[in-house]
């Protein structure tokens, strides 16, 4: 028997040698438009810092920089049982979290429910009824025949919301493919609590949070070096602690200047004016055809919701401008379906370990009903790499901007989301971009490192509910609307 030794990573050196010249020209064009060099990254970050600062001002800016009314990090001594409701772009998750006596300890039980596509463009009342259906089902399953009382809820509502209070929030605009009439500009807590009351459920929203804020708090609970929480998933966002004295729009609250206040950046809206982002024609098409043209410019270039669509549009562009160059004499009708491909499609292509791209060929055959040639597979492989690399490098700009704004030289960043956890090479590409932007010497280790976050939308929501009840008990009711109702939950 011959020992073959350790398996080497696949090498694609020279794999373009058999690609025809006219396809190579398209590959070269894609390389030109999707590559973001160091100078461009730095220019983006400088503008990003200015936009973050502007968002904290009284006048505001493109980036909302929403005040969350989470005042400080947990100390690990929080206790109690809390419900957490996580309404993301794909799933609805209901959790029961018990913060134990052990420092930093918790127990969790949870159930996940699919968010039906028809709800995303349906009626507001249908949304709230469905959410409460899921919560009621969860309680009946885990607490059958129990007489429950006083259930504080941390509601992870991962959409831009203005919060004058931690227990209330007005939806600014839908993102992640949602477009439900009658919710934007309205407080989302009363209609939810109304349905809880109608069903006889003793649940009070103790905290309305964003998943990014939850990620920040949950991660710092287990790692005090965590200073930033990020989401790289269906959408993109970050949260961090800002000193109250550096938030002009909070000056009227007369908070101690050094009091930490968690800011939910909502920086998917960065550069909506298209000043610094290197947009391609495909980015413009995505924006034009989206439910919210002119909004979420940064998110549309980096988030998982759009990466597969960028990939699809680039291929359709070749089909339309040079008919017969690719997929000759084949039915390409599947490829022309908008949003048929999500980010898992280019991710799977990048993960194909075989030199002959056999897995990519099978994927294309199964999803698009196209039998691709080896040259076409190489084109798709390179296109997937370019789109994934651009997303990772641009994503690093948001982290770098917060570090520069706060003069953070070294820290841990807690990250979550499907792109971060599942997209191949995303972490390494983002880390490389941070090195370039922040000018670390080649001999220096990475000073700002991105790590897998704790469960922000579950444990984070419970922790923030606990922190809120804790400060109500202590008499600190800043940013709390229903303090008396909250006190009754303690």
From Swiss-Prot:
GO terms for cellular component: cytosol; mitochondrion. The keyword Transferase applies. Its EC number is 2.7.1.1. PROSITE patterns: HEXOKINASE_1, HEXOKINASE_2. Residues 21-466 form the Hexokinase domain. GO terms for biological process: glucose 6-phosphate metabolic process; glucose metabolic process; glycolytic process; intracellular glucose homeostasis; mannose metabolic process. Residues 210-455 are annotated as: Hexokinase large subdomain. Pathway: Carbohydrate metabolism; hexose metabolism; Carbohydrate degradation; glycolysis; D-glyceraldehyde 3-phosphate and glycerone phosphate from D-glucose: step 1/4. GO terms for molecular function: ATP binding; D-glucose binding; fructokinase activity; glucokinase activity; mannokinase activity. It catalyses: a D-hexose + ATP = a D-hexose 6-phosphate + ADP + H(+); D-fructose + ATP = D-fructose 6-phosphate + ADP + H(+); D-glucose + ATP = D-glucose 6-phosphate + ADP + H(+). InterPro entries: ATPase_NBD (IPR043129), Hexokinase (IPR001312), Hexokinase_BS (IPR019807), Hexokinase_C (IPR022673), Hexokinase_N (IPR022672). Keywords: Allosteric enzyme, ATP-binding, Glycolysis, Kinase, Nucleotide-binding, Transferase. Residues 75-209 are annotated as: Hexokinase small subdomain. Catalyzes the phosphorylation of hexose, such as D-glucose and D-fructose, to hexose 6-phosphate (D-glucose 6-phosphate and D-fructose 6-phosphate, respectively). Mediates the initial step of glycolysis by catalyzing phosphorylation of D-glucose to D-glucose 6-phosphate. Monomer. Belongs to the hexokinase family. This is Hexokinase. It comes from Emericella nidulans (strain FGSC A4 / ATCC 38163 / CBS 112.46 / NRRL 194 / M139). The gene is hxkA.
């Amino acid at each position: 028997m011959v020992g073959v030794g350790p398996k080497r990573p696949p090498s694609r050196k020279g794999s373009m040698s058999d690609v025809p010249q006219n396809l190579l020209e398209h590959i070269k064009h894609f390389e030109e438009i999707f590559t973001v060099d160091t100078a461009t990254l730095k220019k983006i970050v400088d503008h990003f810092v200015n936009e973050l600062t502007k968002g904290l001002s009284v006048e505001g800016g493109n980036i909302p920089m929403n005040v969350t009314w989470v005042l400080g990090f947990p100390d690990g001594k929080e206790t109690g049982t809390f419900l957490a409701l996580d309404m993301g772009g794909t799933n609805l998750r209901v959790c029961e979290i018990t913060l134990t006596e052990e420092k930093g300890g918790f127990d969790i039980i949870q159930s996940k429910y699919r968010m039906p596509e028809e709800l995303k463009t349906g009626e507001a009342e249908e949304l709230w009824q469905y959410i409460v259906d899921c919560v009621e089902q969860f309680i009946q399953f885990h607490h059958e025949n129990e007489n429950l009382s006083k259930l504080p809820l941390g509601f992870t509502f991962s959409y831009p919301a203005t919060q004058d209070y931690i227990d209330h929030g007005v939806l600014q605009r839908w993102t992640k493919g949602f477009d439900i009439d009658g919710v934007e500009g309205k407080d989302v807590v009363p209609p939810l609590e109304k349905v809880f009351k109608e069903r006889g459920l003793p649940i009070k929203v103790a905290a309305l949070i964003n998943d990014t804020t939850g990620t920040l708090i949950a991660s710092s609970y287990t790692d005090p070096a965590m200073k930033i929480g990020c989401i790289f998933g269906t959408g993109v966002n970050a949260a961090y602690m800002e000193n109250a004295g550096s938030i002009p729009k909070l000056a009227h609250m007369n908070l101690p200047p050094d009091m930490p206040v968690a800011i939910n950046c909502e920086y998917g809206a960065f550069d909506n004016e298209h000043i610094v982002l290197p947009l391609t024609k495909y980015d413009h098409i995505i924006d034009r055809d989206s439910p919210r043209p002119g909004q979420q410019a940064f998110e549309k270039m980096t988030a998982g919701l759009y990466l597969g669509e960028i990939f699809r549009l680039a291929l359709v562009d070749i089909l339309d401008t040079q008919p017969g160059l690719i997929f000759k004499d084949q039915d390409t009708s599947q490829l022309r379906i908008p949003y048929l491909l999500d980010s898992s499609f280019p991710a799977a292509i990048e993960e194909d370990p075989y030199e002959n791209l056999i897995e990519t060929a099978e994927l294309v055959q199964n999803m698009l009903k196209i039998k691709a040639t080896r040259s076409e597979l190489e084109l798709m492989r390179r296109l997937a790499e370019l789109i994934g690399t651009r997303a990772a490098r641009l994503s690093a700009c948001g982290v770098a901007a917060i570090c520069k704004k706060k003069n953070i030289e070294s820290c841990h960043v807690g990250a979550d989301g499907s792109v971060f956890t599942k997209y191949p090479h995303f972490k390494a590409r983002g880390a490389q971009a941070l090195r370039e932007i922040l000018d670390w010497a080649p001999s220096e280790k990475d000073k700002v490192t991105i790590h897998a976050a704790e469960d922000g939308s579950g444990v984070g929501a419970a922790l923030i509910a606990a922190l809120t009840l804790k400060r109500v008990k202590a008499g600190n009711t800043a940013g709390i609307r229903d303090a008396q109702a909250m006190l009754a939950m303690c």
